[in-house]
């Protein structure tokens, strides 16, 4: 009987391992220097135009962005509102348990809401690039 207990003990012993997320981080090769620009292919399913909330002339539209939250929503709203062709921009999270971001853009007659969204995304990316380069510059000078 003691032999059975000993076998059960050895069968259930687990060797200590690092948590899975730490193992995955070690396997990833991340370049933080910014020396190498990598172009990612755009995800066509990431942003959806909500056709029910879009005007015929395209000056007002609502979009749904998948897998995003307040972090992108507030920054994007701020950058889009800096555009003088934009009359209104607001965002909402429909429900806390859903990872969706709804954004509404209304423009003056010269610009479409799609153009304003594209310009806002580009301007936000440019802003992030400047912040990253300044940060990297300061880190290297330390």
Curated annotation (Swiss-Prot):
Q: Where in the cell is it found?
A: Nucleus, Nucleolus
Q: Where is this cross-link: Glycyl lysine isopeptide (Lys-Gly) (interchain with G-Cter in ubiquitin)?
A: 134
Keywords assigned:
DNA-directed RNA polymerase, Isopeptide bond, Nucleus, Phosphoprotein, Ribosome biogenesis, Transcription, Ubl conjugation
Q: Bias category Basic and acidic residues: which stretches? A: 1-11
Record-level GO cellular component terms:
nucleoplasm; nucleus; RNA polymerase I complex; RNA polymerase III complex
The annotated region (Disordered) lies at 1-45
What organism is recorded for this protein?
Saccharomyces cerevisiae (strain ATCC 204508 / S288c) (Baker's yeast)
Protein family per UniProt = Belongs to the archaeal Rpo11/eukaryotic RPB11/RPC19 RNA polymerase subunit family.
- Per UniProt, the ranges with Acidic residues bias are 24-42
Quaternary arrangement and interactors, per the entry?
Answer: Component of the RNA polymerase I (Pol I) and RNA polymerase III (Pol III) complexes. Component of the RNA polymerase I (Pol I) complex consisting of 14 subunits: RPA135, RPA190, RPC40, RPA14, RPB5, RPO26, RPA43, RPB8, RPA12, RPB10, RPC19, RPC10, RPA49 and RPA34. The complex is composed of a horseshoe-shaped core containing ten subunits (RPA135, RPA190, RPB5, RPO26, RPB8, RPB10, RPC10, RPA12, RPC19 and RPC40) where RPA135 and RPA190 form the DNA-binding cleft.
- Residue(s) carrying Phosphothreonine: 15, 33
One Pfam match, given by its short name, reads RNA_pol_L_2
What is the protein's known function? DNA-dependent RNA polymerases catalyze the transcription of DNA into RNA using the four ribonucleoside triphosphates as substrates. Common core component of RNA polymerases I and III which synthesize ribosomal RNA precursors and small RNAs, such as 5S rRNA and tRNAs, respectively.
Q: What is the name attached to this protein's record?
A: DNA-directed RNA polymerases I and III subunit RPAC2
